[in-house]
């Protein structure tokens, strides 16, 4: 498993490998720096995970629902591409509530796939998009893999998960899951790769 808890050691994940001569060898991820030389290039996916999982209720019935934010479609209109659960009960025209004071409300305006929906958030704080995003993300949780959420007694992420489920070089917001290989890079390993006099490039 790539990620279990805050006790997870990012760079100590190990794998049984076979060397060039066909001999079995056990390596930890942090050993990767031993295979790079001066002049080599590290390419990092610097996409930053945002708190994409929201929990709320459906209008009238107060049924519990889950919304997984995928991407913002239109900032001015507050449109988001999302996945929903339970999909069969969330239809066009339904309103979804995400807080106790009904400030963060979304209306379903389109079905995109069996679980996919387009939501329009009915939130207006003087038209300030940054305030809206901060308020929306404050209600969200770290988008941990489902097998981790299901294994927890309360089925929720913690505040610490947002840091643990993030690559140390993450910079540009937009990911709903951390790049798997990048999760293994610890800050110490990042420093070691820099000391190799290798070049670093990023993609988002």
Where are these regions (language model features)?
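Serine residues within intrinsically disordered or low-complexity segments
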Residues: 198-204
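A cross-family signal for N-terminal binding/gating loops and helix N-caps
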Residues: 3-198
């Amino acid at each position: 498993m790539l990620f279990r808890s805050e006790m997870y050691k990012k760079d100590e994940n190990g794998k049984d490998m076979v060397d060039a001569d066909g001999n079995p060898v056990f390596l930890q991820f942090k050993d990767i720096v031993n295979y790079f030389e001066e002049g080599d290039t590290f390419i990092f996916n610097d996409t930053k995970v945002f708190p994409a999982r929201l929990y709320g209720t459906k209008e009238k019935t107060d049924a519990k629902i889950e919304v997984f934010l995928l991407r913002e479609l239109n900032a001015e209109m507050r449109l988001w591409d999302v996945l929903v659960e339970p999909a069969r009960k969330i239809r066009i025209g339904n309103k979804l509530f995400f807080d106790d004071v009904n400030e963060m409300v979304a209306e379903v305006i389109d079905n995109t796939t069996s679980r996919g929906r387009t939501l329009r958030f009915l939130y207006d704080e003087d038209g300030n998009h940054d305030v809206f995003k901060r308020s929306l993300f404050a209600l969200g949780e770290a988008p941990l893999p489902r097998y981790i959420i299901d294994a927890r007694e309360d089925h929720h992420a913690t505040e610490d998960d947002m840091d643990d489920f993030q690559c140390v070089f993450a910079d540009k917001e937009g990911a709903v899951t951390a790049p798997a290989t990048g999760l293994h890079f610890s800050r110490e390993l990042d420093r070691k790769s820099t000391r190799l006099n290798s070049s670093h490039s990023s993609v988002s």
